[in-house]
């Protein structure tokens, strides 16, 4: 497996590590998303312990408003984080 493929599989594995805990095994409920963000992105996203911030992120990701974040919806967060990280690298 290439380095990029390994990283892509890692993103999938992290999603599943949190999605299987409660509710549907392949979606994140708000509590699971909060745990994922708090533990996996503490240095990337600001105010991750603030419930209002989590609520806003969840609402923005939950495109179909079913109170769950699918992997497809989660990838929007990953994309935003990657774009921000890329932009920050070019600022240095």
Swiss-Prot record:
SUPFAM superfamilies: EF-hand
Signal peptide: none
Record GO terms (molecular function): calcium ion binding; calcium-dependent protein binding; RAGE receptor binding; zinc ion binding
Function: S100A12 is a calcium-, zinc- and copper-binding protein which plays a prominent role in the regulation of inflammatory processes and immune response. Its pro-inflammatory activity involves recruitment of leukocytes, promotion of cytokine and chemokine production, and regulation of leukocyte adhesion and migration. Acts as an alarmin or a danger associated molecular pattern (DAMP) molecule and stimulates innate immune cells via binding to receptor for advanced glycation endproducts (AGER).
InterPro entries linked to this entry: EF-hand-dom_pair, EF_hand_dom, S100/CaBP7/8-like_CS, S100_Ca-bd_sub
GO terms of biological process kind: antimicrobial humoral immune response mediated by antimicrobial peptide; endothelial cell migration; inflammatory response; innate immune response; positive regulation of canonical NF-kappaB signal transduction
Organism annotation: Sus scrofa
Cell membrane as UniProt keyword: yes
Amino acids binding Ca(2+) 1: 19, 24, 27, 32
Domain EF-hand, residue spans: 13-48, 49-84
Cellular component, GO annotation: cytoplasm; cytoskeleton; extracellular region; plasma membrane
Chain segments carrying region Hinge domain: 38-53
Residues binding Zn(2+), per UniProt: 16, 26, 86, 90
PANTHER family cross-referenced by the UniProt entry: PROTEIN S100-A12, S100 CALCIUM-BINDING PROTEIN
One Pfam family recorded for the sequence: S_100
Additional comment: In the absence of zinc binds one calcium ion per molecule, in the presence of zinc binds two calcium ions per molecule.
SMART domains associated with the record: EFh (SM00054), S_100 (SM01394)
Binding site for Cu cation: 16, 26, 86, 90
Entry's localization field: Secreted; Cytoplasm; Cytoplasm, Cytoskeleton; Cell membrane
Domain notes: The hinge domain contributes significantly to its chemotactic properties.
Membrane topology of this protein: Peripheral membrane protein
Keywords: Calcium, Cell membrane, Copper, Cytoplasm, Cytoskeleton, Immunity, Inflammatory response, Innate immunity, Membrane, Metal-binding, Repeat, Secreted, Zinc
Protein name: Protein S100-A12
Matching PROSITE patterns: EF_HAND_2 (PS50222), S100_CABP (PS00303)
Predominant subcellular localization, coarse grouping: secreted
